[in-house]
Amino acid sequence: MAVKIKLTRLGKIRNPQYRVAVADARTRRDGRAIEVIGRYHPKEEPSLIEINSERAQYWLSVGAQPTEPVLKLLKITGDWQKFKGLPGAQGRLKVAAPKPSKLEVFNAALAAADGGPTTEATKPKKKSPAKKAAKAAEPAPQPEQPDTPALGGEQAELTAES
């Protein structure tokens, strides 16, 4: 059976996301896969490429043929060089810089503006006094009494006695 390592498409229009999948060569692009060994998101900066190196090495060793786009991804991650015994097995994958936490950014902005935070970053919301006063001034609605008494239970006995 001819096995290929190929990309199966996910995502929305104009936002492609791919799975790196091992599948029979005769299956369609998004058809049934034998195994999913990674994912690829080209729209992120830098592109997200996650490939399980151990499983990729296994499938290459048993004769699976990568498609051209997958071959480029394997060269970027260094899996193809490792399989072929070529130099550069560490790959040239770009890593995104870690994002600073929002609290750190907030405190840094406060420090730059006034010289330091005067209060906590998170404070519970309080209701405005105008709304509280309006609710207190409004009388509570009284439940309306029905004009005709219900004829059931004890009330039926009371009306029968009178």
From Swiss-Prot:
Bias (Basic residues) ranges: 124-134
A single MF term (Gene Ontology): structural constituent of ribosome
Region Disordered, residue ranges: 113-162
GO terms classed as biological process: translation
Annotated GO CC locations: cytoplasm; plasma membrane; small ribosomal subunit
Keyword terms of this UniProt record: Ribonucleoprotein, Ribosomal protein
HAMAP family (UniProt xref): Ribosomal_bS16 (MF_00385)
Family: Belongs to the bacterial ribosomal protein bS16 family.
Protein name: Small ribosomal subunit protein bS16
Organism per entry: Mycobacterium tuberculosis (strain ATCC 25618 / H37Rv)
